[in-house]
């Protein structure tokens, strides 16, 4: 085996990780087979892709990292497209010899041995000319983090860019002769690049590890050429114009924007080297002196993230699946709990695992947390009948229960889309004509794209055909998502703009009924304090109002017997259309229809359950 870039990232999480791996020391300096590396690298790339695609999903329990090889390969083709576009741009920027390939067999590799341990990495794009070597690391994230996420200024109105576009490459620009306050603000943002567990810093850390391996390899071979390090990511400002050659999409430069953006990380990765060297010392000590005894958990665990530590179940064995100390309504690491503002890792490290492990005095001045705790301790239901009734009175019938399924493809597929646009391929609609009057089958319509081609216009036509924009209420769980999709479609198909905007404007959210919406309830005449309170709570919600949690509390309806159980499984199924046999495709479409129909029917059922609850509550 060898310590690859991915191994390095994992083995330096904490002291315990390498001990749990039970590494064989006699294999530490051996060559890793290309097959072993490819398998490991593909998993890492897939994980990165998932992080970017599903960063806004509510399907926190969906584990797509365990999909079959067929599913993994189908999704990975989008990652390979990003690599290919990055290679095209590299050839426009640099001269000399290029080495890149969709197949890791043909990629440039670097390795060296240190204290009996071999370190190894492959390079996505390698460029060499007479003067220098250029290393381009390709990531499927977008430029938004490095452009929008790193803006700084002396006040909220002043926005300076940390990276400035020069000759096709974004380059670091530190403030010169700026005020002390400006320099302080710059440094605060600059530190984010060195936070290996943040969305901004993780890819920089990845490239810094590569630099460490590459420089030691070159040093061992006495190669003294200058080496430049670049990060290539998708350009969040790029809007695809729909141009195709035959059946192939061509991502042309549009208004000066390329589909990928290059960031010069030379200075930053150089500054990282002492940090990496220190981590190497720690890693080697942990390997040669393994200690699997418990250690503190922390941000390095990446708990509940796509990149979470694979030994999470060992270190978090005492944390209950439901009603843990993490599950208090409104609890975030930024807000914290208790006098010391404990984040979730502090809670675990100090022995607070369950909901009732938290001292009740920590919940004072946190009324929703107190409601949750009271329901948990006393096995009771909390219900604000008046607020829910007032919300029902705002509804205008018919109610159009609407749910979209979308595919946030890394590479924009259709005209008007950007990288990771939530491209809709399906919707379900249940029409509730009067309170409780809605037939599961007769009052339902499902539109599903028949192919992977652009069928958005057909979808829009069905929406405006079945939803009257002049009356009724569009209803959704997390209505912001449905509103945003309707408005995006309106701009792409301006002939339907008025109708789609009117539908979006006449909308409300299931969460306003079951949870709250402070501004709406204040408009309805409730005081500020009461408007902030949740309307309903049952201990089985475990602090969450997702439809998957509320449904079993208020009905017998379940997703467990469905082939497609959540939105992420839905989009993966859709993305596999072209890889299926006719029989598989027919079954997949049936499963997608059943799942999407279940989502809107669930809203009908939950709303009716609430209606009956307030009607029967004394």
Regions found by a protein language model. Name each.
Residues 103-111, 398-408, 509:
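Two-metal-ion RNase H-like nuclease active-site motif
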Residues 37-61, 150-195, 251-268, 521-535:
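Charged, glycine/proline-rich intrinsically disordered loops and linkers
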Residues 83, 87-91, 135-137, 149-165, ...:
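Conserved RNase H-like, two-metal-ion catalytic cores of nucleic-acid enzymes
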Residues 1-135, 141-175, 324-329, 333-381:
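Metal-dependent nuclease catalytic cores that hydrolyze phosphodiester bonds in DNA/RNA
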């Amino acid at each position: 085996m060898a310590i690859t870039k991915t191994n390095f990232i994992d083995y330096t999480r904490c002291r315990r990780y390498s001990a749990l791996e039970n590494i064989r020391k006699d294999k530490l300096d051996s060559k890793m087979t290309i097959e072993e590396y490819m398998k490991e690298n593909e998993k890492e790339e897939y994980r990165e892709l998932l992080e970017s695609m599903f960063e806004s999903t509510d399907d926190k329990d969906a584990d797509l990292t365990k999909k079959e090889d067929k599913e993994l390969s189908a999704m990975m083709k989008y990652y390979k497209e990003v690599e290919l576009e990055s290679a095209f741009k590299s050839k426009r920027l640099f001269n000399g010899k290029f080495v890149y390939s969709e197949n890791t067999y043909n990629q440039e590799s670097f390795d060296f041995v240190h204290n009996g341990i071999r370190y190894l990495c492959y390079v996505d794009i390698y460029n060499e000319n007479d003067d220098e070597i250029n290393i381009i690391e390709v990531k499927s994230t977008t430029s938004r983090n490095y452009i929008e996420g790193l803006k700084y200024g002396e006040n909220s109105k002043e926005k300076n860019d940390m990276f400035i576009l020069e000759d096709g490459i974004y380059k670091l620009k530190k403030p010169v002769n700026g005020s002390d306050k400006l320099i302080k603000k710059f440094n605060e943002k600059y530190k984010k690049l060195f936070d290996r567990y943040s969305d901004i810093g993780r890819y920089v850390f990845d490239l810094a590890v590569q630099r460490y391996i590459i420089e030691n390899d070159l040093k061992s071979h006495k190669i003294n050429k200058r080496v430049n390090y670049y990060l290539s990511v998708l350009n969040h400002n790029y809007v695809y114009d729909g141009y195709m050659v035959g059946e192939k999409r061509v991502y042309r430069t549009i208004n000066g924007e390329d589909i990928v953006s290059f960031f010069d990380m030379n200075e930053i990765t150089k500054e990282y080297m002492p940090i990496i060297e220190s981590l190497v010392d720690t890693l080697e000590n942990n390997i040669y002196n393994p200690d699997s005894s418990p250690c503190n958990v922390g941000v390095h665990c990446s708990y509940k993230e796509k990149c979470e530590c694979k030994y999470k179940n060992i270190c978090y064995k005492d944390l209950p699946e439901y009603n843990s100390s993490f599950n208090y309504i409104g609890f975030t690491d930024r807000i914290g709990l208790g006098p010391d503002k404990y984040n979730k890792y502090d809670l675990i490290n100090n022995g607070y695992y369950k909901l009732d492990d938290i001292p009740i005095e920590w919940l004072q001045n946190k009324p929703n947390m107190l409601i949750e705790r009271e329901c948990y301790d006393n096995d009771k239901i909390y219900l604000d009948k008046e607020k829910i009734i007032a919300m029902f009175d705002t509804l205008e019938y018919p109610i159009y229960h609407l749910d979209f399924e979308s595919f946030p493809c890394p590479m924009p597929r259709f005209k008007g889309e950007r990288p990771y646009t939530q491209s809709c391929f399906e919707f379900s609609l249940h029409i509730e004509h009067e309170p409780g009057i809605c037939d599961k089958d007769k009052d339902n319509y499902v539109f599903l794209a028949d192919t992977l081609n652009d069928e958005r216009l057909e979808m829009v036509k069905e929406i405006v055909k079945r939803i009257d924009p002049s009356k009724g209420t569009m209803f959704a769980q997390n209505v912001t998502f449905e509103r945003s999709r309707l408005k995006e479609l309106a701009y792409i198909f301006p002939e339907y703009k008025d109708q789609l905007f009117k539908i979006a404007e006449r909308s409300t959210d299931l969460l306003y009924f079951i949870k709250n919406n402070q501004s709406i309830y204040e408009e309805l005449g409730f005081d500020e304090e009461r408007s902030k309170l949740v309307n309903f709570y049952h201990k089985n919600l475990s602090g969450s109002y997702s439809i998957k949690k509320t449904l079993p509390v208020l009905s017998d309806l379940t997703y467990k017997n469905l082939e497609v159980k959540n939105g992420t499984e839905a989009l993966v199924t859709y993305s596999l259309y072209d890889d299926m046999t006719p029989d598989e495709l027919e079954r997949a479409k049936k499963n997608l229809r059943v799942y999407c129909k279940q989502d809107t029917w669930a809203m009908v059922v939950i709303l009716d359950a609430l209606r009956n609850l307030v009607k029967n509550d004394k």
